[in-house]
From Swiss-Prot:
GO molecular function, one term: serine-type endopeptidase activity
EC number: 3.4.21.47
Domain notes: The unliganded VWA domain has an inactive 'locked' conformation whereby the scissile Arg-256|Lys-257 bond is protected from proteolytic activation.
Biological role: Precursor of the catalytic component of the C3 and C5 convertase complexes of the alternative pathway of the complement system, a cascade of proteins that leads to phagocytosis and breakdown of pathogens and signaling that strengthens the adaptive immune system. The alternative complement pathway acts as an amplification loop that enhances other complement pathways (classical, lectin and GZMK) by promoting formation of additional C3 and C5 convertases. CFB is cleaved and activated by CFD to generate Ba and Bb chains; Bb chain constituting the catalytic component of the C3 and C5 convertases.
Subunit structure and binding partners: Monomer. Interacts with complement C3b; this interaction is dependent on the presence of Mg(2+).
Domain Peptidase S1 span(s) in chain numbering: 474-754
Primary site of residence: secreted
SUPFAM superfamilies associated with the record: Complement control module/SCR domain, Trypsin-like serine proteases, vWA-like
Gene it is expressed from: Cfb
Domain Sushi residue range list: 32-97, 98-157, 160-217
Protein name: Complement factor B
Catalytic site positions: 523, 573, 696
């Protein structure tokens, strides 16, 4: 199989000292002069931009300029009007206190206090009606930038095919049905600009198209920290995902070194705007940003091939991906530093469309037939712009051409959205928020459009990216390449065998969670088992590993309810096997991701500030959750797809526990099914395969964003469907399996794994 490629296209476009005017201008527009008499703002100050062709009002922290933030000098020699959102003209600008928008609506619950507006530091609380579960933040605080902290509060009963997408504060939503193909539409109040997706469709698999919208005022900016976290979490996932598909084992983040073949598995195109509107200092700042980005990519140990070009009226190519040294990051950085702002002095317009057409040409192929493997190429375009252009036409049409070229969004069953990411950075007060939003990708739980105050903030974004100091192992990564064996596809899987004199041999499964520990079920062991009788094998290796000790959850007691007529009680059925010697990771031996760890935060593409609650909402939402377990059949490992009943089918799933052999005296399922269990099996919505006795201790896994995250440990089942090796024969509908929910035993995991550098939240 040809190696899949990742093309990362960096397009750094026109940012001026304050942007450009709100309407496209001709390249040779004559300068006019506007008087400064009467332009003052009450409570603040102003600064001139573009040589006096525009001005920006400045207010103290916690205040914003009313009714506009910027004004342009018109050809008549007068400043643009001070016009409110309601199209009214005011005589003098003033600084007003920043307030956060109020909820336009809130479904299936209530919020308090109710107020026409909310001042900085005000708090608002949300609560759901009976039968609904709260997702997001129950309490939110109005921040200094006019935005609410936390996540959108949503009350959901899990009844829809897709989860309730919610109503972000400040927006209005049209549509309350969440069936497959249903569409919801969002609107903003007059004067506010919608960022994200105005329309979202419920798709196959239960996810919404697009990204969550928000309503933005002109004075709102993203902080460098917010931008760095959101951008980096998505960018690194793209890079890591490309490595996994390429068939290479990255090893630890800071240690992995991948030497690519001559065709390259990653191409990064850096396209730098050198037009007249930028200015020398901003051009230099943009080069520093790109230098930091090159360094960041190099920190992953990959050796991509770079392309480098600048443009104004026309593009100028400086480094081609076919150059012999294009994968040498130091050499590319040297070429970047040699670029001069004067290179485009004679033709200094801003032709954004032509720059994107140059990118399109580099993505294209000669002839009618595409090259082999073209549809496995991933593309990321990063645009830094004010959203305006002064020649060439609308650049959004080229983004549409690129999507068509890459066959993205054409087939609803295979939209291929993962193969194109367009990030847009708006820089300065004169950013056209509508245009930059139109250029950016719209993806669920991701942010692709950002607005920063100035070049200093933009440089800070890339500095914070490069300043990430923690080195984390890449968990939950698999390599699905052609020559891979079962352990390439399940590199975490461990086999545990226990030999007992005069009692025979018992086998269980487990999951590698760190270099010293395997997570499994406690019932696989007996109190009198000797260390030398317990063996562990990993990575498909024939050599058994010696163990140091077995750590049981302190609340596990299989005989805990014998007096009540319950012969076996599996609550807290988890154990950690500590190995005597440190594991050496490789292509067939990697750890699985555990919830509420920093590695899983990155795997889920969440901000670095993500909470354990957000992990749970992503991995175990209130619905039927698609999951899998790995079963050993003969000498092969096979993935079995099941559904965790975590919505309206949960109660009926748990009730079937009373039909298990030995539980005849159990009157209520809650006697044996505690809140620590997850339930799979049955025939609704699909006929789930069941676990077998030898599968005990293995991981229950959620596969999300090309990563594998363990959410449970296989514990016990209602029916032994694998007796006499006749698997899945005449399986009754009440055949259920129960798994220990890892979210319920996190304190114990965190304590026992505290020295394993997993970064528990």
């Amino acid at each position: 199989m040809e190696s899949p490629q990742l093309c990362l296209v960096l397009l750094v476009l026109g940012f001026s000292s304050g942007g450009v005017s709100a309407t496209p201008v001709l390249e040779a527009r004559p300068q006019v002069s506007c008087s400064l008499e009467g332009v003052e703002i009450k409570g603040g100050s102003f600064q001139l931009l573009q040589g006096g062709q525009a001005l920006e009002y400045l207010c103290p922290s916690g205040f914003y300029p009313y009714p506009v933030q910027t004004r342009t000098c018109r050809s008549t020699g007068s400043w643009s009007d001070l016009q409110t959102r309601d199209q009214k003209i005011v005589q003098k600008a003033e600084c007003r206190a920043i307030r956060c928008p109020r909820p336009q609506d809130f479904e299936n619950g209530e919020f308090w206090p109710r107020s026409p507006f909310y001042n900085l530091s005000d708090q608002i609380s949300f609560q759901c009606y009976d039968g609904y579960v709260l997702r997001g933040s129950a309490n939110r605080t109005c921040q200094e930038n006019g935005r609410w902290d936390g996540q959108t509060a949503i009350c959901d009963d899990g009844a829809g095919y897709c989860p309730n997408p919610g109503i972000p504060i400040g927006t209005r939503k049209v549509g309350s049905q969440y069936r497959l193909e249903d569409i919801v539409t969002y609107h903003c109040s007059r004067g506010l600009v919608l960022r994200g997706s105005q329309k979202r469709k419920c798709q196959e698999g239960g996810s919404w198209s697009g990204t969550e919208p928000s309503c933005q005022d002109s004075f709102m900016y993203d902080s460098p920290q917010e931008v760095a976290e959101a951008f980096l979490s998505s960018l690194t996932e793209t890079i890591e995902g490309a490595d996994a598909e390429d068939g290479h084992s990255p090893g630890e983040q800071q240690k992995r070194k991948i030497v690519l073949d001559p065709s390259g598995s990653m191409n990064i195109y850096l396209v730098l705007d050198g037009s007249d509107s930028i200015g020398s200092s901003n051009f230099t700042g943009a080069k520093r940003c790109l230098t930091n980005l090159i360094e960041k990519v190099a920190s992953y140990g990959v050796r991509p091939r770079y392309g480098l070009l600048t443009y104004a009226t026309v593009p100028k190519v400086l480094v081609r991906v076919s150059d012999e040294r294009s994968s040498d990051a130091d050499w590319v950085t040297e070429k970047l530093n040699q670029i001069s702002y004067e290179d485009h002095k004679l033709k200094s317009g801003t032709n954004t469309k032509r720059a994107l057409q140059a990118v399109y040409s580099m993505m294209s192929w000669a002839g009618d037939a595409p090259p082999e493997g073209w549809n496995r190429t991933r593309h990321v375009i990063i645009i830094m712009t004010d959203g305006l252009h002064n020649m060439g036409g609308n650049p959004v049409t080229v983004i549409q051409d690129i999507r068509a070229l890459l066959d993205i969004g054409r087939d609803p069953k295979n939209p291929r959205e993962d193969y194109l990411d367009v990030y847009v950075f708006g820089v300065g007060p004169l950013v056209d928020s509508v245009n930059i939003n139109a250029l950016a990708s719209k993806k669920d739980n991701e942010h692709h459009v950002f607005k920063v105050k100035d070049m200093e903030d933009l440089e800070n974004v890339f500095y914070q990216m490069i300043d990430e100091t923690k080195s984390l192992s890449l968990c939950g990564m698999v390599w699905e390449h052609k020559k891979g064996n079962d352990y390439h596809k399940q590199p975490w899987q461990a086999k545990i065998s226990v030999t007992r004199p005069l009692k025979g041999h018992e086998t269980c499964m487990g999951a590698v969670v760190s270099e010293y520990f395997v997570l499994t079920a406690a019932h696989c062991f007996m109190v009198d088992d000797q260390k030398h009788s317990i063996k562990v094998s990993v990575g498909g290796q024939r050599r058994d590993l010696e163990i140091e000790e077995v750590l049981f959850h302190p609340k596990y007691n299989i005989n805990g309810k014998k007096a009540e007529g319950i012969p076996e009680f599996y609550d807290y059925d988890v154990a950690l096997v500590k190995l005597k010697n440190k594991l050496k990771y490789g292509q067939t031996l990697r750890p699985i991701c555990l919830p509420c760890t920093e590695g899983t935060t990155r795997a889920l593409r969440l901000p670095q500030t993500a909470t354990c609650k957000q992990h749970k909402e992503q991995l175990l939402p209130v619905k039927d959750v698609k999951a899998l377990f790995v079963s050993e059949q003969g000498k092969s490992l096979t993935r079995k797809e099941v559904y965790i009943k975590n919505g309206d089918k949960k109660a009926s799933c748990e009730r079937d526990a009373t039909k298990a052999q030995g539980y005849e005296k159990v009157k209520d399922a809650s006697e044996v099914v505690t809140p620590r269990f997850l339930c799979t099996g049955g025939v609704d919505p699909y006929a789930d395969p069941n676990t077998c006795k030898g599968d005990s201790g293995g991981p229950l896994i959620v596969h999300k964003r090309s990563r594998f995250i363990q959410v449970g440990v296989i514990s016990w089942g209602v029916v032994d469907v694998c007796r006499d090796q006749r698997r899945q024969q005449l399986v009754p509908s009440y055949a259920r399996d129960f798994h220990i929910n890892l979210f319920q035993v996190l304190p114990w995991l965190k304590d026992k794994l505290k020295d394993e550098d997993l970064g528990f939240l």
